[in-house]
């Protein structure tokens, strides 16, 4: 896709400042992200949370404008809870991703500056990647943000759909740490979420425990 003018500026805002990773295997989904927030070349915050949860079995990773991401996170929670109290019952992960894609597509001329991974477990593990235009793809593994070229190289080299959830968690951790070493907008440490049929577990890893 050729990006020009304002679209290039938006793309740069989304790419600069984070690295997130998603991996899908038979037992569940891994979501991982670093903890650094940048304002230009300034490190604005060293302990930002970029892995969030809609339910115990559905999570997201975030990249982009903080204000837009907070709004979109509220939208996602409202979509899930609204469906849960209606006759339709709980919405699927694919349904949530599709609804968000519709929201983003409808506002593409005045877009929310976001890049979202939605992953979780309903009747099976699912992982979706959405950009600010509402484009949606289902993935087995994916990386977003400024460190994504480095992280994606690790994933491409080592991903195996038959790997266990623990092995996938270790791969995601190493992919983000590889980005931390090479990308100045990615840093501090990594949050890794393991989402499976019984819920989720979260692990944290840091370059320096005193940070």
From Swiss-Prot:
* Localization in the cell: Cytoplasm
Instruction: Report the HAMAP family cross-referenced here.
Output: Proteasome_B_A
Question: For this UniProt entry, what's an example GO CC term?
Answer: proteasome core complex, beta-subunit complex
Q: What is its EC number?
A: 3.4.25.1
> What domain of life?
Archaea
Q: What is this protein called?
A: Proteasome subunit beta 2
Residues making up the propeptide: 1-17
Active site residues of this protein: 18 (nucleophile)
Reactions catalysed, as given in the entry: Cleavage of peptide bonds with very broad specificity
Q: What family does this belong to?
A: Belongs to the peptidase T1B family.
Gene (name only): psmB2
As one GO molecular function, the record gives:
threonine-type endopeptidase activity
Task: List keywords of the entry alphabetically.
Answer: Autocatalytic cleavage, Cytoplasm, Hydrolase, Protease, Proteasome, Threonine protease, Zymogen
The UniProt entry lists the main location of this chain as cytoplasm
């Amino acid at each position: 896709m050729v990006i020009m003018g304002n679209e290039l500026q938006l793309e740069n805002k989304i790419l600069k400042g984070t690295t997130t990773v998603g991996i899908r295997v038979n037992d569940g989904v891994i979501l991982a992200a670093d903890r650094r927030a940048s304002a230009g070349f300034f490190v604005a915050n060293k302990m930002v949370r970029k892995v969030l949860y809609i339910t115990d079995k559905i999570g997201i990773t975030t990249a982009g404008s903080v204000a837009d991401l907070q709004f979109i996170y509220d939208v996602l929670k409202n979509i899930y809870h609204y469906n849960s109290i209606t006759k339709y019952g709980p919405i699927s992960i694919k349904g949530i991703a599709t609804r968000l894609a519709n929201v983003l597509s409808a506002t593409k001329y005045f877009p929310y500056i976001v890049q979202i991974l939605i992953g979780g477990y309903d009747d099976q593990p699912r992982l979706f990647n959405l950009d600010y235009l509402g484009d949606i793809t289902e993935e087995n593994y994916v990386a977003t943000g400024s460190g994504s070229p480095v992280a994606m190289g690790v994933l491409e080299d080592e991903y195996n759909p038959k790997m266990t959830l623990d092995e996938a968690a270790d791969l995601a951790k190493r992919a983000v740490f590889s980005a931390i070493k090479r990308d100045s907008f990615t840093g501090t440490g990594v949050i890794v979420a393991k989402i499976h049929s019984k819920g989720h577990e979260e692990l944290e890893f840091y370059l320096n425990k005193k940070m």
